[in-house]
A protein has these predicted regions:
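Transmembrane-helix bundle segments that line or gate the permeation/cavity pathway
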Residues: 154-155, 160-163, 167-168, 198-214, ...
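Short helical (or helix-break) motifs at transmembrane helix termini and adjacent helical loops
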Residues: 127, 159-174, 372-381
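Alpha-helical transmembrane segments of multipass membrane proteins
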Residues: 19-24, 45-46, 114-118, 139-140, ...
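C-terminal transmembrane helix pair
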Residues: 6, 12, 178-194, 198, ...
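Central hydrophobic cores of alpha-helical transmembrane segments
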Residues: 132-138, 155, 256-266
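Membrane-embedded alpha-helical segments and adjacent helix-loop junctions characteristic
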Residues: 52-142, 293-379
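Hydrophobic transmembrane alpha-helices of multi-pass small-molecule transporters
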Residues: 1-72, 194-196, 200, 209-315, ...
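Short juxtamembrane and helix-loop transition motifs at transmembrane-helix boundaries
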Residues: 1-4, 87-97, 114-118, 213-227, ...
């Protein structure tokens, strides 16, 4: 069959069918997303061949899709290694014990949200926040008997806030660059949607965090088990300080993680001078295996290792293969282009831009593309009606990068689920910050409150 340009109707049908397959498989039947995503890749490949696309076209689409994830995949592998050595060296157990002594049960969940927000702004990486301080706070919550999904929601909400508002964040810099807005003006302008989202999220975490029962006996028992089996000290916080220094010095993620793993390995050898190279290799590859007298502590701290990230890596490769093919065959672009012609009102334009970012997260699963594609598609429309580039860059964050954590087959969502051990569909209702950000952004667009216009229109 001769290859022809994909029509709008055809694009919409394909996107609806693919989303239906993924949604029914993951949500209705509770399947792990890896196989349904691979099945959609197979279906799209079959359609592409029927439409006249060559195997080379298909392979190029897959390669282009996966290409954007090579660095994140490498970072995920390093984070897996970091989690294992951090537990072995007593870093995560030390944070847990210190947390037991410093955070009251009644204000625990809001405290998790606030701490992860602060760390996220300082580090500029939601992934690193979740996989380090986030895991320690999750452990504290488990020991307190808090709802795991609620605690995970607070951790992710704080990490997303920090990632969104940090000048060190990749996604923040990307949104600013795509919209051609000045970085710090962009961060300042985001407060119109970010502050209300943060405030409402904090209230909801406080209300829901007080609804559970905290068991002080279990907390004391867990603290004692940790102190009996790990080296608990303030020195264990040294790798965290190193991470903050690297963020302040704007050192990229990969060398930061390498340095952190190296200094943690040195700490392990100081604590256990006779540690063999074989056991260290096994720790980095397969993670830490806790063997304490408490089964709940063992379940909580048996994690990490490069191998623990392989399921996430497989999902990312499959999802981005699908996304790359959708882009290569112009399916996503052809579905977006007609929308631009009819958007001459700020409220309508902002709403459609946010919905487009959400849809790209659903179909492509990659947060950077959920910023880049709507940014390129709708920038002329923002310019045409006189909106400032700051309006566009804020919308790209609110509908793009913050949403990826809510997608079971998304890069960020699958990573958070793997790191915390809570499925996306369980923590999704509690990631209030990500859920509220697009709502307040649309409200701003419809009402005009906090909406930034180009200077020539003012």
């Amino acid at each position: 069959m001769e290859k022809k340009k994909v029509t709008l109707t055809e694009s919409i049908i394909i996107l609806i069918v693919l989303l239906a397959i993924l949604g029914i498989s993951v949500i209705k039947f509770g399947l792990s997303p890896e196989v349904p995503v691979l099945f959609t890749v197979l279906l799209l490949t079959f359609w592409a061949r029927l439409r006249g696309f060559s195997w080379q076209d298909i392979q190029n689409g897959i390669k282009e899709g996966i290409g954007v994830a090579i660095i994140p995949i490498f970072i995920f592998m390093l984070i897996g290694a970091l989690i294992g050595v951090w537990i072995k060296a007593g870093i995560i157990p030390s944070i847990m014990v210190l947390g037991f002594n410093m955070i009251s049960g009644s204000f625990f969940v809001p405290s998790v949200f606030i701490v992860c927000s602060i760390v996220g702004v300082a580090i500029g990486s939601g992934f690193t926040t979740i996989s380090t301080v986030g895991i320690a706070l999750f452990g504290i919550g488990s020991s307190m008997g808090a709802n795991p999904a609620l605690v995970a929601g607070a951790i992710i909400s704080g990490a997303v806030f920090g990632d969104k508002m940090s000048p060190l964040s990749d996604s923040t810099n990307l949104s600013s660059a795509v919209a051609e807005s000045e970085l710090f003006s962009h961060i300042k302008n985001m407060m119109w949607s970010t502050i209300p989202s943060f405030g409402v999220s904090l209230i909801l975490f406080w209300i829901l965090g007080n609804s559970g029962h905290m068991d002080p006996t279990k907390i004391e028992r867990t603290s004692q088990v940790l102190q009996n089996n790990f080296t608990i000290s303030w020195w264990a916080l040294l790798p965290i300080v190193l991470m903050l220094i690297c963020a302040w010095r704007k050192i990229p993620a990969i060398p930061t993680l390498f340095m952190n793993i190296a200094i943690t390995v040195v700490m392990i050898f100081i604590q256990s001078p006779h540690e063999s190279a074989q056991s260290l290799n096994n720790l980095i590859m397969n993670g830490f295996v806790a063997k304490t007298s408490d089964a709940s502590v063992n379940a909580l701290l048996t994690r990490g290792g490069i191998s623990s990230m392989m399921a996430t890596v497989a999902l990312i490769i499959s999802t981005l293969s699908l996304g790359g093919m959708l882009m290569k065959f112009n399916i996503v672009q052809s579905a977006m282009e007609p929308l631009v012609k009819h958007l001459n009102k700020p409220g309508r334009l902002i709403t459609v831009t946010i919905i487009s970012g959400i849809c790209i997260n659903l179909f492509v699963g990659e947060q950077y593309l959920s910023v880049i594609l709507p940014g390129r598609a709708f920038k002329p429309a923002f310019d045409k009606i006189g909106l400032s580039p700051l309006a566009l860059s804020r919308v790209l964050e609110d509908g793009g990068s913050v949403i990826n954590y809510l997608i079971p087959w998304g890069v960020a969502g699958s990573f958070a689920a793997s790191a915390l051990g809570v499925p996306v569909l369980q923590f999704l209702p509690f990631v209030f910050f990500s859920l509220l950000s697009p709502v307040f952004s649309i409200f701003s667009g419809v009402t005009g409150i906090g909406l930034k216009w180009a200077k020539k229109n003012k």
